Amino acid sequence: MRYIGAHVSIAGGIENAPLRAQEIGATAFALFTKNQRQWKAPALTAKTIEAFRENCERCGYRPEHILPHDSYLINLGSPDAQKLDRSRNAFIDEMQRTEALGLVRLNLHPGSHLRESSEEACLETIAESVNLAHEATNTAVAVLENTAGQGSNLGHTFEQLAFIIQRVHDKSRVGVCLDTCHLFAAGYDLRTEEAVNGMFELFDASIGLHYLKGMHLNDAKPELDSRRDRHESIGKGKIGLDGFAAIIRHPASAEIPLILETPQPEIWSEEITLLRSFEEAQNC
């Protein structure tokens, strides 16, 4: 079975996220655990935590199919010592919030060197940031999201992601979330079944499919290898429906959250139905 959903709003309280996911027919979902535009947020109350857990259980969402995302402000590879410390503290707080909610994974953008340090130094810093977060928490898995390679953001190649993972001490608490738009922007073709199969084979050889903990399903506005992060609705961009059908049918996409971050929330339910139809067609 494929667990397909979207990154839903937490407006009115984080406990509303599973209800919004249910409204669009999702079997998985992503969310922020706080306002992602702010460094600090009030601690989660016992009442909020209980309501969130109850709504997840009532709506049938298991922890492994929920993928919280950390704040975009965080840069775990920052070359600035003060900003790095602030980012690390914020990330630890988000890992702790993830655990408090009873969830098991936290999606993060690896980091950026801001053209002030070498790529290798930045990747080393990111790995050490993850290690420090592990030391300060108990169970949450840090899930590295591949990037589009825009600007000085790292994590756009499988080699860079593997470099980080190799330096994380607790391998059981690190993984990868593959964003299809980012993959395409970074030069990984996804337009055909052959291309998709090749991408997963390369990922397995470079990193290992057992590290794949989730995917973001987004079509891409720009052409292949554009290094531009511009999401498009499923089937409306340069990847196209054949690519997404191949992803849904590939064994690697089973049992992990498959999350839409496409630009039209009003058609998420339609996109979920479309993606699910690819799996149903395979089972016929």
Curated annotation (Swiss-Prot):
Keyword Protein biosynthesis listed: no
Cofactor field: Zn(2+)
Classification via SMART domains: AP2Ec
EC number(s) given by UniProt: 3.1.21.2
Residues where Zn(2+) 1 binds: H69, H109, E145
Record-listed Zn(2+) 2 binding positions: E145, D179, H216, E261
Binding site for Zn(2+) 3: H182, D229, H231
Cofactor note: Binds 3 Zn(2+) ions.
Gene3D superfamilies in alphabetical order: Divalent-metal-dependent TIM barrel enzymes
Name recorded for this polypeptide: Probable endonuclease 4
GN (gene name): nfo
